[in-house]
UniProtKB/Swiss-Prot annotation:
The name this protein goes by in its record: Zinc finger protein 215
The UniProt record lists the keyword DNA-binding: yes
Gene3D superfamilies per the UniProt record, alphabetical: 6.10.140.140, Classic Zinc Finger, DNA breaking-rejoining enzymes
SMART domains with a match to the protein in the record: KRAB, SCAN, ZnF_C2H2
Domain SCAN box residues, every copy: 48-126
Zinc finger (C2H2-type) stretch: 379-401, 407-429, 462-484, 490-512
């Protein structure tokens, strides 16, 4: 191994003569043979270059590209003759040399280290020697003093900088470009923009904390938030147009709501950002929502009976609808039902005001609430929750849950849960009595045929006057009497043959159909 003092005599690689460069390459090949004696280095470098500089455009598809890369890697590393340790050592040495500065890489080749540990020891010795001699890095031939700086290139140093604005990180689209994006890309754009804004907001807070109190006081007086779009109709207040100095807060609200960028159905206006600031951990300015109408009282807008809370578009219009009188200054009320219209106004000593949505009800819901004053069901069943407008209806309904049957038939002892059912039952008893007392066999109507077996007690109430045969249905008695009278009311239209039953006529007509076929 060459002495360390020889390092100072080595110039940059681009200043080496052709003979010296060839000497470096020859020494490099000899060093590889000494490091891994088992490896055959005749075509190792050529195979490595083919593997490292392989291009995808030279093949027809991904499968062929992967296959060729695998083949080139096998030709370079030769796993059939090299051990895993040798292959790993070769890969580590290659990568370590690649990350070194160019002048250091050339010098390391000339030293012929046996392994990666020797290479690290060489570099540490050179750095220590240069620091001891106090040699300036700029004047030295190999410029070894810059090694530490290049190793620490990723570490942030220097004085703190001013926080960047949203303009520095925003990605802009034209109207045509935005229209061609699908919903997934638009959602991704939204997430990235909100994430950038959250990061910028945190940087802004840290920057403000480092400023003196007086400068913060002056800056707070000059700030104005830029809000270009109008708040949707469903919001409570009319937003004031506020212009002023551009800030990161104002830029994101302006950027994300102007036409050509995320449309109203995606962002739902500025109101969408304010409703979601807790979800995204961002703090948007509240100055833009200072109401034009100020209330001196902090009393809630309420309806005194059912204690419901509404979100309204216009307090005065709702009170006019509910009470039919113009609203007065102060806290509007519906004195009949005490419906609350809730505001939280706290502008004393603060730069912003807050309001909260209690229920997302529209104006139509408020009108329906007024109509419900006259149709409210105030009698509710405690078991199933069903409500009724009359107490008598609730009492009848509760009989279903208790299973109570308070109405009893005095003749047969049967119970019913409703008086109407008992009345119908008693009418059947009266009809049965009239039928049994009149033994004339006269057929009664179908509703009086006594289909309820509990009333009949097994007796047939329809008796034939000719033969004394009885039936439990009037229709059966009528069909039976046709036998005695010889009546045949069912006549065939083709052959004029008559039958006393419709079923016999149907069978006869099937014979005609069979003969025709």
């Amino acid at each position: 191994m060459q002495p360390l003092s020889k390092l100072m005599a080595i110039s940059k690689p681009q200043n080496l003569s052709l003979h010296e460069q060839r000497e470096v390459l020859r020494a490099d090949m000899c060093w590889q043979q000494e490091t891994i004696p088992v490896m055959e280095t005749h075509d190792s470098e050529a195979s490595r270059q083919k593997f490292r500089h392989f291009q995808y455009l030279k093949v027809s598809g991904p499968h062929e590209a992967l296959s060729q890369l695998r083949e080139l890697c096998l030709q370079w590393l030769r796993p059939e003759i090299h051990t895993k340790k040798q292959i790993i050592e070769q890969l580590v040495l290659e990568q370590f040399l690649a990350i070194l500065p160019e002048e250091v890489r050339t010098w390391v080749h000339l030293q012929h280290p046996n392994n990666s540990e020797d290479m690290v020891t060489l570099i540490e010795d050179v750095i220590e020697m240069l620091e001891d001699e106090g040699m300036p890095c700029k004047d030295s031939a190999p410029q070894m003093g810059s090694i530490k700086e290049k190793m620490k290139a990723g570490s942030p140093t220097g004085k703190p900088q001013e926080p960047v604005t949203f303009k520095d990180v925003v990605v802009e689209f034209s109207k045509e470009e935005w229209g061609q994006l699908d919903s997934a890309v638009k959602n991704l754009y939204r997430n990235v923009m909100l994430e950038n804004f959250r990061n910028l907001n945190s940087l802004r807070k840290a920057h403000l904390l480092s400023k003196p109190f007086e400068s913060l006081k002056l800056e707070s007086r000059k700030k104005r938030w830029i809000m270009e779009k109008e708040i949707p109709r469903k919001t409570i207040f009319d937003m004031k147009s506020i212009s002023g100095e551009e800030s990161s807060h104002g830029v994101i609200v302006t950027r994300l709501t102007e036409s050509g960028h995320p449309s109203s159905d995606v962002w739902k206006g500025e109101n969408w950002l304010y409703r979601n600031q807790k979800k995204w951990d961002i703090n948007l300015p509240q100055e833009a929502f200072i109401p034009e109408t100020s209330y001196t009282d902090e009393e809630d807008f309420e309806c005194s009976e059912n204690k419901e809370t509404f979100d309204i578009n216009s307090v005065s219009s709702i009170c006019a609808i509910q009470q039919g009188i113009p609203s007065r200054k102060g806290s509007p009320k519906c004195d009949k039902f005490k419906t609350q219209f809730k505001f939280n106004l706290d502008s004393v000593g603060k730069q912003h005001s807050e309001y909260e949505y209690v229920n997302d009800l529209s104006l139509r819901t408020d009108i329906r609430h007024q109509k419900s004053h006259t149709t409210m069901n105030s009698y509710e069943c405690y078991q199933c929750g069903k409500a009724f407008c009359r107490s008598s209806s609730l009492i009848r309904h509760q009989i279903i849950h208790t299973g109570e049957k308070p109405y009893k038939c005095s003749e047969c002892g049967r119970f019913f849960n409703r008086r109407t059912n008992l009345t119908k039952h008693q009418k059947l008893h009266a009809e049965v009595k009239a039928c049994t007392s009149n033994k004339c066999g006269k057929a009664v109507s179908k509703s009086e045929d006594g289909n309820n077996p509990a009333l009949h007690f097994g007796n047939n109430f329809y008796e034939c006057v000719n033969c004394g045969k009885s039936f439990n249905r009037s229709s059966s008695l009528i069909r039976h009497q046709m036998i005695h009278t010889g009546e045949k009311p069912f006549k065939c239209k083709e052959c004029n043959k008559a039958f006393n039953r419709s079923s016999n006529l149907v069978k006869h007509q099937k014979l005609h159909t069979r003969d025709k076929s």
